[in-house]
């Protein structure tokens, strides 16, 4: 096999090599059954065992309390932008949203189709380079829920704290930072996460929802989008994305083998610190984000001269450092360093950046 590259893609993102090798070994013949997971009935004993283990492993990793349901759904996080409102926002009701970047804004725009949305705080006041402190927020006393995105993959902002919302359920889009470190699930009413960053391949979204929030869907909510229907049917109201579910389960197994989220969190802290420390010490590279609000998962950086962007990317590709181009809306570069990216990838990137700076700085 040719040497695998270091993949810094924001999503679909790198998967652990051990998971890919396991999937490869089981592709044609899962556990001696003579068929692939892709060919199994989702209601077979074999697949039900896969699904059950995946859920239990995720519960173990995040210490999910028993009064929360874990759902494996379709449509990605973008579908959740509507699904949340259809389930949790009553007719003539109101919800509070925190704006920290493009993904927050997409959630706000979609939810606005179904009710009154109060933007309780916005990072726009800081040009999206810092997160407004909670003392600046203007939360509604009668909000059905408070929604925020703990990590903005495009801008590179991340909360290092959990908002206080009292009795109002806190809803979080954790598509890009779930499983990156320990988390107190009990602080949230609901968490959702598209799989293709820290969970598995694209095609599935994980929803962790407190049981008392089920059964609130509006009359116009399609059956397929009703969280209670999904929970009552074990996430199998219709045929689920079985391959993505299976692969996500393999990632959960791998995470447990690595020592769980505590061990992964320590690795991630070292990874992000190594990269940011180099960028901050450099004269060629820069990161504009307020230091306490910097993302552990997505590190945007710019070169002092935009004319160097193309040669930088070409050289990176030649060195097996892939998908470093920043999002088209912000430009520059971005290194997405999710759980599957190890310190060797960070060291290789820093070494290349040093060499490039010596040549072009």
Swiss-Prot record:
The modification N6-(pyridoxal phosphate)lysine is found at residue 197. GO terms for molecular function: O-phospho-L-serine:2-oxoglutarate aminotransferase activity; pyridoxal phosphate binding. Its EC number is 2.6.1.52. Binds 1 pyridoxal phosphate per subunit. It holds the Pfam family Aminotran_5. Pyridoxal 5'-phosphate binds at residues 77-78, 103, 153, 173, 196, 238-239. Keywords: Amino-acid biosynthesis, Aminotransferase, Cytoplasm, Pyridoxal phosphate, Pyridoxine biosynthesis, Serine biosynthesis, Transferase. It is an enzyme of class 2 (transferase). The keyword Transferase applies. Pathway: Amino-acid biosynthesis; L-serine biosynthesis; L-serine from 3-phospho-D-glycerate: step 2/3; Cofactor biosynthesis; pyridoxine 5'-phosphate biosynthesis; pyridoxine 5'-phosphate from D-erythrose 4-phosphate: step 3/5. Its main location: cytoplasm. One of its GO terms (biological process) is pyridoxine biosynthetic process. GO terms for cellular component: cytoplasm. Catalyzes the reversible conversion of 3-phosphohydroxypyruvate to phosphoserine and of 3-hydroxy-2-oxo-4-phosphonooxybutanoate to phosphohydroxythreonine. Homodimer. NCBIfam families: PRK05355.1, serC_1. Belongs to the class-V pyridoxal-phosphate-dependent aminotransferase family. SerC subfamily. This is Phosphoserine aminotransferase. It comes from Pseudomonas syringae pv. syringae (strain B728a).
């Amino acid at each position: 096999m040719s040497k695998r590259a270091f993949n810094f893609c924001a999503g679909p993102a790198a998967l652990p090599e051990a998971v890919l090798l396991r999937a490869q070994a089981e592709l044609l013949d899962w556990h001696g059954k003579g068929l692939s997971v892709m060919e199994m009935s989702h209601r077979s004993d074999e697949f039900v065992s896969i699904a059950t283990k995946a859920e239990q492993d995720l519960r173990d990793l995040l210490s999910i309390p028993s009064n929360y349901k874990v759902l494996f759904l379709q449509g990605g996080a973008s579908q959740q932008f509507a699904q949340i409102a259809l389930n949790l926002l009553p007719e003539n009701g109101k919800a509070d949203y925190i704006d920290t970047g493009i993904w927050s804004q997409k959630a706000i725009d979609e939810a606005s189709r179904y009710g009154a949305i109060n933007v309780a705080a916005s990072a726009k006041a800081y040009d999206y380079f810092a997160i407004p402190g909670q003392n600046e927020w203007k939360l509604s006393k009668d909000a059905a829920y408070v929604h925020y995105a703990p990590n903005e993959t495009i801008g590179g902002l991340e909360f290092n704290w959990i908002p206080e919302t009292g009795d109002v359920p806190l809803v979080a889009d954790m598509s890009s930072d779930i499983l990156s470190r320990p988390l107190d699930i009990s602080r949230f009413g609901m968490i959702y996460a598209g799989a293709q960053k820290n969970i598995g391949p694209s095609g599935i979204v994980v929803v962790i929802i407190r049981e008392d929030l089920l059964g609130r869907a509006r009359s116009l909510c399609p059956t397929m989008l009703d969280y209670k229907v999904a929970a009552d049917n074990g996430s199998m109201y219709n045929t689920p994305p079985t391959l993505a579910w299976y692969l996500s389960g393999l990632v959960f197994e791998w995470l447990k083998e690595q020592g769980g989220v505590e061990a992964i969190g320590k690795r991630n802290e070292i990874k992000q610190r190594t990269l940011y420390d180099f960028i901050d010490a450099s004269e060629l590279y820069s990161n504009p984000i307020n230091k306490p609000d910097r993302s552990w998962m997505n590190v945007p950086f710019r070169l002092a001269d935009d004319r160097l962007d193309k040669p930088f990317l070409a050289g990176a590709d030649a060195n097996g450092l892939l998908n470093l181009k920043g999002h088209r809306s912000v430009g520059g570069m971005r290194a997405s360093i999710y759980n599957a990216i190890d310190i060797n990838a960070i060291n290789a990137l820093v070494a290349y950046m040093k060499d490039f700076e010596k040549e072009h700085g």
